[in-house]
Swiss-Prot record:
Stored SUPFAM superfamilies: ARM repeat
Taxonomic path: Eukaryota, Metazoa, Chordata, Craniata, Vertebrata
Gene3D superfamilies given in the database record: Leucine-rich Repeat Variant
A Pfam family annotated for this UniProt entry: HEAT_2
Key words of the record: Repeat
Name of this protein: HEAT repeat-containing protein 4
GO molecular function, one term: oxidoreductase activity
HEAT repeats by residue range: 530-568, 724-760, 761-794
Region spans: Disordered: 135-175
Amino acid sequence: MTRTQKGKTFLPHCFYQSLPPRLGWGMILNYSKLKGKEECASVSSVPMVFFSSQYRLHRKSQYLKMAAANLTFSQEVVWQRGLPSIPYSQYSFDHLYNTNDIIHTPQIRKARPQKPVSFKFLGSSSPLTGDTSLAVKTESSANPEKKLKKSKPASTVREAPRPLIHHPCMHPDMLGRPPSLDVNLEEREAWLLPPEKEARAWEATVLEKLNERTARWIQSKRPRRPGASPNKWQSFLRQQYDWSHIRDELTSASDLELLKQLEAEETAEFEDQSVILPPQEKKKPELLLPVYYRLPSYFQQAETVEIMPGNKSTEDIHEKTSLSQPQTQSYFRQVTPRAGKFAYSTDNTFEQEIYFDEVQIIHQIGAKRDQIVLENLNRYNKQLSKVFPETPEKWSAQAIPEASYRPVQGALRWTALPTPAKDMLLQVGEKDVPIKTRRLKKQAKSLQEDVTWELVVLRRMLKEWKTAWALIIEWHHETVENLLQSLGDLHDDVRIKAITTCATAALERPRIATSQRDSDKTIQDLPEVLLPALEAALCDKNAHVRMAAAICQYAIQSHNPLARNIMQTALLKGNSVDSWAAAQCLALEGTATYPVIKRILHQLFTKKNEDTEEQSYILLSYLSEKTTLIHTMLAVELNSCQWKNRIVACQAFSRISGNVCLDMKHKLIQLMWNDWNKEVRRAAAQALGQMSLGKEVHDIIRVKLGQGNSQERVEALYLIGELKLMTAKLLPSFLHCFSDDFTAVRRAACLAAGALQIRDKMVLECLLNLMQRDPYWKIKAFAIRALGQIGQVSPELTDLLLWAIHYEESPGVRLEACRSILALKLQGDRVRDTFLDVLLLENHDAVLKEMYQTMKILNLGNEGNQEMLQEIKNRIKTLSQKDLLTHKILKLEMVMGKVREEAKRVYLKPKGEQGPLTLQTLLQETFQDEMVLPRRPSEVCDTEAVIKPVKPRAPNPWLQSSVPGLTTRSKVRSSLVKDLRTSPEKRIAVGPFRSDYPALYLGKFSERTFFSPIMSSPSGKKGAHL
């Protein structure tokens, strides 16, 4: 063994030669057969011999078997390479909760004192290795579990594993620990074998290809120990990347100064030295589009810098700036630019909002005294002067509860203008507590947009175009710099999206003018910086980009001729989406050509929603003032075979303006009277009314209503209801239709009166007359409906409606009466009592449902005489029982028979002044002392149960004989079988007194036969007496 100058121990070279050769994956195998020194030397020194493939596979399999025979791994190796083989109970999840890799802390690597290298030999009797030791444990890996729990920060870089160093003069069965990593490369390379030197030759190649920054970074991770000689990395950096190599080639003084600055930056970066850099220009914050449009609820905030581990420059910037601090610099704004130097201008955000944007200040109860809250929820901190002596909250160590808000006399002086508060938004976990606000003396005027119809059309056009191409645009978060960069992007879709964002912002920005001063302000639709890029997009090689740029030019209303040419090309050759957008843009510009009108009419006749229909009508109405081509093309559609096209053409005539020729008037009148479709006739009549052609229609209706047949009168009345047309000349003929002989005419007159809602006395009298005296129930129902639509309430109408709902036989009339009461909102005790009475007797489901709904809406509660009504219902239910009614009827028959027999058989002397016996007196005397109690359900007689014993039994098929007509059991004659005897035979069987055979009375079984002896008792007595 030898000892070096530094006191480290090394083994002799002979011990190294006794070790077996290494495998490809860096593992040492100890062969028991190779024990001699010569054999070991021969293995390490003999050059490589190429064997056959089969022999190599055979040897490879033997090596694998021998290597895996008693192979064991340390715990640290298992944790690093064999995690799937570790049981779940032994696995540690501490590294999941380690935050060192999220927030990196710079660590300073301290030099450790040198320690002598000591070698420990593990004998063959080691419990881990057995006969052969295959694992090597160093002192640093003595406690692998502790090192695994303590995770390293992400900023540290692990050193690459170095090949195992073989030491000489070691026993073949022993494994030694490699020397310390701090040993110089020169000393380690002195005893390396040639194969090891060749294996390490890759370092020279790697060092040649490393750049300066990577080499210096590696050097910074392995700092030189104090007192030690410079290592190979430091010498490599000096030789490879020394600035003195290029210093002689520089000639200008500026280049030399730049070289010194670069050297100082590198020194500060890798040796932690502070360098005073020249002041740099502060980066100007990007301008948001809402800030450009001066929206009151937007203001710029300071730009935050992303922090990277180890980057001290960004950390210093982060320490100086705040995340929630608003911008410190703001552009100046003036009240009226025309005032020149006499106008007030300011760059304070608070003054700009309250003076220029006219945002009101909200005085909140319980708010902070040092803050100002505006209508847009922006908060500003007051810059107040200090108050002496200071309050206890400043110098007290204990927390003092916040007192309730109380008025304070006096006000503190402002030392500066208010600044935006940092806590503009609620902090995490803070609740938004509603605060009572004082009522302002003057209510703020509602802000309404001052938008022209051209702008509305452009907004709708752009919205439809974006929806068709599935473009989702959010312009409130875009900046001018970002849009300018996107306009020059390489990809077409990025340019299209940027152009569409510009067009959307120009059209959708708020246009609120609350005063004359605001109306004088001129804010361009887009910043001047973006206009050249947008104009350049008109010459883009992509057709979609050019189309988007043309739409943007029309959005800002620049009247660019190149954009007009693009739109005309898209109108003729483009797809349906682009051609429809082009037609709208060209129509807004006043281009009333045949292709534009044809495309608009095509979109109108194939419309899919109401917005498209409204857009088409607006454009056609605007173009109709410039040309008559629209009326000509619509007149062609009036002769279309499709009734829907005729309706659209009539509606278009009623919406557009312009002069209409006489032929079109006659065509519309013809459609109004003779078209087979009801909707077409209605649309034609409305078109004539909207086109100021009411006189011609009025004269025709007057003639047909007074001199036409029944069908013409019905059509005339229908048109009167549709057009809402009634004059003094039409009224006499209209009143005569209420008494017409035809039902259809009277029905049409009621419908027209309800549609016109005429409150004329004569019309109301005609409707009341139909309601009372018309023989057809439908006419009564239509008259009642017309009275409900007119809404004229009178006592006579109330009486007639209540009478109709109570006594009319037709359910339809009662239903319409109930609906008219609801329409007229009739209330009161009389109405409620009538409804309650009708509910007891009404049996129609529709009428009952309508009555319940009417009572619920009119709040006609069921309080009234509910107790009395319930008692009446219970009494009726009790008296309506079948057995009680049968008993009363039989008793009444018995009494009447007795009275009849007494009058026939017994002579009674008449009494003076005694009137004849009436039915009412007879009923009172018969049922005077009788009390009827309501029965329980169990006491009610079950008729089926009573009749069941006397019913004939059903034949049993198993007891019948196979021979038809023969049965095993004789048929039992029942008393319910029809008696086939004649009347003389029945009288002979009954006898002269009809009391011997009561069961044969009337020839059938009935309840009446049970009382026959009682009823025939007078005759029995008479027979006995005779």
